[in-house]
Amino acid sequence: MTVKPKLNVLLCAPRGFCAGVVRAIDAVEEALRIYGAPVYVRHEIVHNKYVVETLKSKGAVFVEELDEVPDTSQPVIFSAHGVPKSIPVEAATRNIFAIDATCPLVTKVHREAELHHKRGRQVLLVGHAGHPEVVGTIGQLPAGSILLVQTIEDIASLQVEDEHNLSYVTQTTLSVDDTRSMVEALTRRFPDIVGPHREDICYATTNRQEAVKQVAPIVDALIVVGSSNSSNSQRLKEVAERSGCKLARLVLRAEDVEWELFANISSLAITAGASAPEILVEEIMDAFAERFDLHVEEVSTANEGVFFPLPRELRRATV
């Protein structure tokens, strides 16, 4: 009988689904229950391939643009990342029943940007170019109204209309530390710049990054369960590396684990991005249990009791 090597596993808590992701997935499942298949979803409802494939198997059809929707008698759901204002307008023009599953914390950023614009301030957006959330936020205002700022170097070369009449908002899934540095650089260059009353980085992003900071320096390796196109999952891997973990990997399924890298470790931390379901954490844990004698301990750094109700279009339908 082969003796398995011992492995101490620290499970980060909180990890996995946030309230906005739960709400978005529930919205698709509730729409399927009420209206039947197909239910169309513009863009991946959340950035997790397992979640998307599971919803496809239940009758969801994912599209990138509304002109890909052939049947306007069936609902279309907007993803948790938010959409430009032109998308609901296009849906209304085509008489499409749209259900907005934008995370309420992303909607908060949209409203902040609109308010700054209404008050005559130029808006700077700290975020990553091309991310659906950034595209959606920029699309809340007339073209050219928002300047995207991606790096501290961008700040040094920014050309603004009036440095005394500026505001900023941020993408919700950024690195907390990077964003803090960006905001500090903005306020140094533009002392009069106006920011949000409460930071735009969402509670789940902050909590998951803080949990990783606690465990990363004391383990041989760390796995982030999540998809490669998930911004918050990518940031967790970066946070682990910056916090002193020499081996940090982003893994979606057990089959993706590069086992040769983990052959000689004695301690491992596992977390999951905000769009990664717990079933994938369990799958990866089971795969490690086949190869190691596990001692598992959960490390809790925050308690989350956040809940967001279903989109109002679905609440009306269930009354």
Curated annotation (Swiss-Prot):
EC numbers, comma separated: 1.17.7.4
Superkingdom of source: Bacteria
Keyword 4Fe-4S: yes
Class of this enzyme: oxidoreductase
Associated pathway: Isoprenoid biosynthesis; dimethylallyl diphosphate biosynthesis; dimethylallyl diphosphate from (2E)-4-hydroxy-3-methylbutenyl diphosphate: step 1/1; Isoprenoid biosynthesis; isopentenyl diphosphate biosynthesis via DXP pathway; isopentenyl diphosphate from 1-deoxy-D-xylulose 5-phosphate: step 6/6
One of the GO biological process terms: dimethylallyl diphosphate biosynthetic process
Alphabetized UniProt keyword annotations: 4Fe-4S, Iron, Iron-sulfur, Isoprene biosynthesis, Metal-binding, Oxidoreductase
Catalytic machinery residues: E133 (proton donor)
Keyword Metal-binding recorded: yes
Cross-referenced InterPro entries: LytB/IspH (IPR003451)
Positions with a binding annotation for (2E)-4-hydroxy-3-methylbut-2-enyl diphosphate: H47, H81, H131, T172, S230, S231, N232, S275
Record: residues binding isopentenyl diphosphate: H47, H81, H131, S230, S231, N232, S275
Coiled-coil residue windows: none
Binding sites annotated in the UniProt record for dimethylallyl diphosphate: H47, H81, H131, S230, S231, N232, S275
Cofactor note: Binds 1 [4Fe-4S] cluster per subunit.
Cofactor(s) the record lists: [4Fe-4S] cluster
Reactions listed under catalytic activity: isopentenyl diphosphate + 2 oxidized [2Fe-2S]-[ferredoxin] + H2O = (2E)-4-hydroxy-3-methylbut-2-enyl diphosphate + 2 reduced [2Fe-2S]-[ferredoxin] + 2 H(+); dimethylallyl diphosphate + 2 oxidized [2Fe-2S]-[ferredoxin] + H2O = (2E)-4-hydroxy-3-methylbut-2-enyl diphosphate + 2 reduced [2Fe-2S]-[ferredoxin] + 2 H(+)
Binding site for [4Fe-4S] cluster: C18, C103, C202
A molecular function GO annotation: metal ion binding
PANTHER family named in the record: 4-HYDROXY-3-METHYLBUT-2-ENYL DIPHOSPHATE REDUCTASE
Stored HAMAP family: IspH (MF_00191)
Sequence similarity: Belongs to the IspH family.
Described purpose of this protein according to its UniProt entry: Catalyzes the conversion of 1-hydroxy-2-methyl-2-(E)-butenyl 4-diphosphate (HMBPP) into a mixture of isopentenyl diphosphate (IPP) and dimethylallyl diphosphate (DMAPP). Acts in the terminal step of the DOXP/MEP pathway for isoprenoid precursor biosynthesis.
Protein name, entry field: 4-hydroxy-3-methylbut-2-enyl diphosphate reductase
